[in-house]
Amino acid sequence: MNGPALQPSSPSSAPSASPAAAPRGWSEFCELHAVAAARELARQYWLFAREHPQHAPLRAELVSLQFTDLFQRYFCREVRDGRAPGRDYRDTGRGPPAKAEASPEPGPGPAAPGLPKARSSEELAPPRPPGPCSFQHFRRSLRHIFRRRSAGELPAAHTAAAPGTPGEAAETPARPGLAKKFLPWSLAREPPPEALKEAVLRYSLADEASMDSGARWQRGRLALRRAPGPDGPDRVLELFDPPKSSRPKLQAACSSIQEVRWCTRLEMPDNLYTFVLKVKDRTDIIFEVGDEQQLNSWMAELSECTGRGLESTEAEMHIPSALEPSTSSSPRGSTDSLNQGASPGGLLDPACQKTDHFLSCYPWFHGPISRVKAAQLVQLQGPDAHGVFLVRQSETRRGEYVLTFNFQGIAKHLRLSLTERGQCRVQHLHFPSVVDMLHHFQRSPIPLECGAACDVRLSSYVVVVSQPPGSCNTVLFPFSLPHWDSESLPHWGSELGLPHLSSSGCPRGLSPEGLPGRSSPPEQIFHLVPSPEELANSLQHLEHEPVNRARDSDYEMDSSSRSHLRAIDNQYTPL
């Protein structure tokens, strides 16, 4: 593994190379060296972890993936640079070509170590007698003139000639040639940045256009390079579009990367292996790779460049919260039923307490109900309830929220983030408030991967209702308002237009003490369906009362005249 393995070793060095028997084939050869490399890598892994406790330890799988990528790159480079000049490594073991047998034996000449370092085998060959001018000779001359040498190779050639005679050392820089006279820029240039990782991926820019029309995936080449900087070598991330382009479309230093993380299933439900890259003062970019191995490899590389470990990200996603409802005493699967409501009376995280007052006054906010319950609420009527939604607290990320909506009979979940000022972020769009976000998705379709065929707009929402004490016969009854603008909701009309709403600004009857599900009894998601006689009496009683009267019961009135109970006219009422 440490030497050029494809070159045949000399008979004198073969017995001392290894006490074991020589491998009988390439498979045994690869297995022998893989075992040795794995043993050495594991030893160095534990040694580095003990000597550098300040670095967060990476899992062995991520280390092996990164080691495999780097090993393949450096191994191919060593084999390419270490083989004999003018010979392909695939010709190892074959006899010399036929032309070599007919060629005359070269006479004794200067030894090979005395020659200056060159880039091709033509300069290592002995001088040939001048022949007639031909096209091949002219092409070789032009190739020699226009050949570009990096800046690092010019001192090496001078150093290689230094151990020889003083005449040779002085003769090398004394022959500038035509290239130095007429083409001085072709002799030296800045060395190209070293490629640490490179692959062709699909990417999408998370901007306003992509949010309105859906994600537009493009093919590009993502390259992670090590470039020289004023404070030492720095790592640079470059995106080339098209992939074979020589100039990057986007370029950013790894020090300017603010966040790199996996995309959750809520953000990319139809794309499994995606990660998002957030660069300072740039548009967020979503990348998609082919499989999980490539995803973990890229995440390990980028996390190492930014100085953020992967363990903290994974712990945030997978560690369950001790304050999660219905999870402290029994598993989630055994308690997720419609007969058990969430209990918001317990203590919440400080992050939840800072942002809950922005949403607690609205009837579409259901608090800490589970993902299964939210899905059951929005998909009760199947495809007929297309666009019905509710907002709830996130189960896995405390302090964040989820927009659950019905898409052709299937529940979809979209994660929301709120700042301390009430500003809302959905995927990569920012809104002044959650209400502005809901109005946006009422007018514009929610972007899904399937494009125009998956058009879904928010049409109505499920209202939070509570179960009266002492009631035992209940029927699942989600309320929904097909027209939920400020004109159709006299009780919440002024509040829906507010970008930020504190708990003190809740309308009368909807204060935190009087909110359904916010009082001392636990929140329930049921409602009693009254008898036809009671509904008729309620209609007669409501005709003589003012329209703007505060709500006295849990029944929601129609938006036009407020004279019809939503329990009758609601097209989403289950039979």
From Swiss-Prot:
Domain spans labelled SH2: 364-462
GO molecular function annotation: protein tyrosine kinase binding; signaling receptor complex adaptor activity; stem cell factor receptor binding; transmembrane receptor protein tyrosine kinase adaptor activity
PH domain segment(s): 194-307
Source species, domain of life: Eukaryota
Residues found modified as Phosphoserine: S13, S103, S120, S150, S330
One of the GO biological process terms: erythrocyte development
Ranges of biased composition (kind: Basic and acidic residues): 83-93
Any one cellular-component term (Gene Ontology): cytosol
Signal peptide positions (record): none
Low complexity bias locations: 95-104, 152-174, 325-337
Record SUPFAM superfamilies: PH domain-like, Phenylalanine zipper, SH2 domain
Tissue specificity: Preferentially expressed by lymphoid cell lines.
Post-translational modification comment from the UniProt entry: Tyrosine phosphorylated by LCK.
InterPro entries in the record: PH-like_dom_sf, PH_domain, Phe_ZIP, Phe_ZIP_sf, SH2, SH2_dom_sf, SH2B, SH2B3_SH2
Keywords: Diabetes mellitus, Phosphoprotein, SH2 domain
Disordered: annotated segments: 1-23, 83-136, 150-176, 322-346, 503-525, 546-575
Family: Belongs to the SH2B adapter family.
Subunit structure: Binds to the tyrosine-phosphorylated TCR zeta chain via its SH2 domain.
Disease: Celiac disease 13: A multifactorial, chronic disorder of the small intestine caused by intolerance to gluten. It is characterized by immune-mediated enteropathy associated with failed intestinal absorption, and malnutrition. In predisposed individuals, the ingestion of gluten-containing food such as wheat and rye induces a flat jejunal mucosa with infiltration of lymphocytes. Type 1 diabetes mellitus: A multifactorial disorder of glucose homeostasis that is characterized by susceptibility to ketoacidosis in the absence of insulin therapy. Clinical features are polydipsia, polyphagia and polyuria which result from hyperglycemia-induced osmotic diuresis and secondary thirst. These derangements result in long-term complications that affect the eyes, kidneys, nerves, and blood vessels.
Biological role stated in the UniProt entry: Links T-cell receptor activation signal to phospholipase C-gamma-1, GRB2 and phosphatidylinositol 3-kinase.
Protein name, UniProt field: SH2B adapter protein 3
High-level lineage: Eukaryota, Metazoa, Chordata, Craniata, Vertebrata
This protein's encoding gene: SH2B3
